[in-house]
């Protein structure tokens, strides 16, 4: 499967869309994902990492409330990307429920976060 096909596969997952921003793939999350969708998404991300795409951004600016599955899968993605010396940046709005959750759980201290105002 080539990079364009994998990008279309990711876009077919409920609630997300992908963009190429500079040298990173940005995935915009709009709603929590069911576990089945996460399996499709993780497989696609893994394939793209194997193709050498190791810089990622997860845009959470439109996500109101992530579920526990989302949080666990985000941490899984971080570890997979770091294994290939890549980087995953989480983009969120200051004061949003996602930002507050990341502060409360202290994920903000261990993950790479970019805050939009």
Outline where the language-model segments fall.
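A short acidic, often aromatic-flanked loop/helix-cap motif at beta-alpha or helix-coil junctions
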Residues: 25, 58, 117
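Short acidic-hydrophobic, aromatic-tinged amphipathic segments that line or gate anion-handling sites
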Residues: 109-117
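Amphipathic alpha-helical interaction surfaces in cytosolic regulatory modules
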Residues: 32-110
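STAS-typified acidic loop motif
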Residues: 3-43
């Amino acid at each position: 499967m080539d990079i364009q096909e994998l990008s279309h596969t990711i876009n077919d997952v409920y609630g997300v869309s992908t963009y190429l921003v500079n040298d990173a793939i940005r995935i915009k999350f709009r709603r929590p994902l069911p576990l089945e969708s996460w399996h499709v998404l993780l497989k696609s991300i893994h394939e793209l990492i194997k193709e050498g795409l190791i810089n990622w951004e997860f845009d959470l600016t439109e996500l109101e409330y992530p579920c526990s599955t989302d949080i666990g899968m985000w941490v899984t993605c971080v570890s997979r990307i770091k294994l290939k010396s890549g980087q995953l940046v989480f983009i969120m709005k200051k004061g949003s429920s996602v930002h507050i959750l990341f502060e409360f759980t202290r994920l903000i201290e261990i993950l790479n976060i970019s805050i939009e105002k």
